[in-house]
């Protein structure tokens, strides 16, 4: 070890000891792993804070144009390891922790995941923040500081149970409370006309208090900001009620306001839950817009140049009410005339759509919006009036066209269409894969595209290689470093250099040893969390994502049962041992998804305890899936299941993370699977099933799922076993309604239509896995082809084509 490195390591060790004494308040020789995590985090926080302040000063002095990224969720995961890597302090911290006989990875494991998101939407936002900082974009993320996240998942008797995720109960070293940054956010009341203007009267008020988290760039001194809002009641408690013994009433007003920032996506199956969701969306959007305008006016004397200095991006429709809120602020508070305000608004906003399913496009009842946001509803009506007048000139005498375009759905209960508001109020709208973006303008947004064909574009998603390869898979990263050098972390296209090594027996041996080590780690985690012992020498077949019918976890289960029945029928055949791994959460009110989780456990209980099967087949469900769990699963996967019905998955990013770690994909021609196939080669991916045009044609011609049940004996046997209670003997009809729905016309996502192709393709997977050298060659080819799927590339495209922001190199 060099003298300079010793000096640095010694300095970091001294800082750790100092923070144990001064910040954590423990004697160094009595420090627990949690104490050490807190102390090391403070060492990193100190360095990041210096860079952060310098970044803000530089951007303020340069009066840089900034992107403001509004997202309901940011699934950040843990921060410590990422921060130490960004600061190039990982080795120094590891050496410093050696004084306490502890490893850096064990210390980092004591940090809870930040419960600020749920699925792909939030993880994409987190990857984007990482890339914005790394490529040097002046940027600001805005969201909500959820105290309890969405929920932590537990499994009881095979059923998902939800409980709060109190990730903040011991505080977090990564946030900076901003006591001086608080904004009022109003709800309710009514609108009156006074002096020719609309005035919002008698609204209730909650305070939005700012908490900042730092987002370090890699290979740069830049540190960006994620500002999160906490809801604070205007008065803490009703002291009079408290003093009379009415303790519930004393706290009721406080809870009514502050529950806005308690939980991500509260159950919306009740009127109160729906109202709370709308309040959440407006709460963070209003505070964020007030904040960005206040910052702008500190740097510029006028709002006339707002669109030149700020690009506001809507990550899906949750922040779409921001279009009406910016108009309210400009017109009502800044006295800007309507046409000028609207022109400014449209130049400022851009919008990413994340779904192709019409039923998933967010809408709000007009009556609810009238109750919660009466002024905004009035503004939306005015925006709609002017937009429809313009649209009528584009296509005269076509009322059906105007009805589809309208911001208000007049069929049945009147509802505000938030996607339509986002499109009308933005200058650019993007999808997140080439197929998705094409389908947007061909299907759900075709009418808008006929008016504004240039408004729509594509930005294929990406993932940050710093977390999903360098951090999640350190052994593979070391192999890449010794083969390619270290700069692939900032230029993922360099992975193409692996193509020259994919047939190299020595390189393959190293690659396969690393894969097995990661599988051993994953197997230990499965035994610890799911209580099931699995063999790392079996194929690890992985489907980890939100549980949803369109993602077709149920199709995967049908294949598992098919395989189980085949093993029992042909026990002496040379079966490829396989461990099928599921993980993911079902929304608390989504009963079908919860039934799928229960079925996975019921099927697993039978298969895993059948001595006739042994290690030939195991089925496991890993509970409480999140970023840190994914960092264990992704490196250990052999096969990546990406099996959504073609035309339903906008992009997917789990497919990218798994391929980046050397898993082969079995999937439909959907979302980003198509682009993965184009980049890794047709021979290095397993594609099955109907393509999007075939799905559409079959649906239009009249899809009869019973035909497949009647004509495919293996499928009939599987469905009969499920419906007949083979996997639920304590309640034989538990899954009868599920099977009846599949056969009787409820198979909307065409599981039965794709079943035969899926099962046949799984046999091809087995055939390849029997030849380890060929499998390894294709796994390496997958890693080599993943350069284009860096979120750095995605963000550079956003910056160039949508936000028009130049990187600020530090």
Label every PLM stretch briefly:
Residues 1-810:
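A conserved ligand/cofactor-binding region detector
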